[in-house]
């Protein structure tokens, strides 16, 4: 993998390269996941339009750009010169890619699936996260700083609303996850309280998320309509609580 990415980078005169990957389940089933962009060589403008802007403002669409950092070969010079680092253990990959690709000048992409990614049902992202809301708040603080630093708001005017919707949908699924030992009524109240927060309420009233799956569309409609009891009952049935 690294040799192919490196050769792709060198032959294109690029500072970064990326590839597709294979998703793999524990039972051996696998499928190809497309690269972030079609095979080719991209300049800074195309990198911003194809990676940075979607990471900034399009977080609920049908083809969200994910923070798959293991699909790229990065420039050590950029990382060290610009001090691009990680913070925290959740959603940090999105911020890392946002910041890094604001500095990258040339990206070579191959559609070869060079990495095998195990879909682990026991990973942290598949379990109840007790501190998710606090983690997401910190994520938004850092994302806001990046958006301001790199003047991203002009290209992504509703990035806050879009990002808050994405976080809200994750928070709802997390609140009703089997690992949460709170009573159902307390979980429902937690979601209602979250939706009343000014930044979340603004996103709910100011943006109708597009490109959601059928299930998430239903969740979004129930939230926008204030039907939290129905939402809770649907999750109770779904998760057999």
PLM features per residue range, with description:
Residues 13-14, 177-241:
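Membrane-interface aromatic/basic loop that binds lipid-linked glycans or pyrophosphate carriers
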Residues 4, 12, 99, 138, ...:
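Alpha-helical elements of Rossmann-like donor-binding domains used by nucleotide-donor carbohydrate transfer enzymes
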Residues 120-127, 148, 219-224:
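Short, charged, low-complexity loops and linkers
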Residues 138-159, 196-202:
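C-terminal, non-catalytic tails of nucleotide-sugar-dependent glycosyltransferases
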Residues 161-174:
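Amphipathic alpha-helical repeat scaffolds of TPR domains
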Residues 156-162, 185-189:
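Short, charged, amphipathic alpha-helical segments
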Residues 1-91, 95-109, 118-128:
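Donor-binding/catalytic cores of nucleotide-activated saccharide
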Residues 89-90, 97, 106-139, 153, ...:
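Nucleotide-sugar-dependent glycosyltransferase catalytic core
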């Amino acid at each position: 993998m690294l040799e192919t990415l490196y050769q792709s980078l060198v032959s294109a005169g690029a500072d970064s390269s990326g590839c597709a990957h294979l998703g793999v389940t524990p039972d051996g089933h696998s499928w190809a996941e497309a690269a972030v962009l079609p095979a080719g060589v991209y300049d800074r403008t195309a990198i911003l339009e194809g990676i940075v802007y979607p990471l900034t403002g399009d977080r609920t669409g049908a083809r969200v750009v994910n923070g798959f950092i293991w699909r790229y070969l990065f420039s050590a010079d950029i990382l060290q010169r610009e001090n691009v680092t990680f913070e925290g253990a959740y959603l940090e990959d999105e911020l890392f890619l946002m910041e890094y690709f604001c500095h990258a000048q040339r990206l070579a992409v191959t559609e070869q699936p060079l990495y095998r990614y195990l879909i682990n049902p026991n990973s942290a992202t598949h379990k109840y996260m007790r501190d998710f809301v606090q983690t997401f708040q910190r994520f938004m603080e850092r994302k806001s700083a990046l958006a301001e630093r790199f003047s991203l708001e002009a290209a992504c005017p509703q990035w806050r609303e879009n990002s808050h919707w994405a976080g809200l949908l994750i928070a709802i699924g997390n609140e009703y996850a089997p690992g949460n030992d709170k009573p159902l009524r307390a979980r429902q109240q937690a979601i209602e309280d979250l939706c009343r927060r000014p930044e979340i309420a603004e996103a709910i009233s100011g943006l109708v998320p597009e490109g959601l799956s059928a299930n998430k569309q239903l969740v979004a409609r129930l939230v926008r309509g204030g039907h939290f009891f129905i939402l809770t009952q649907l999750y109770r049935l779904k998760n057999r609580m």
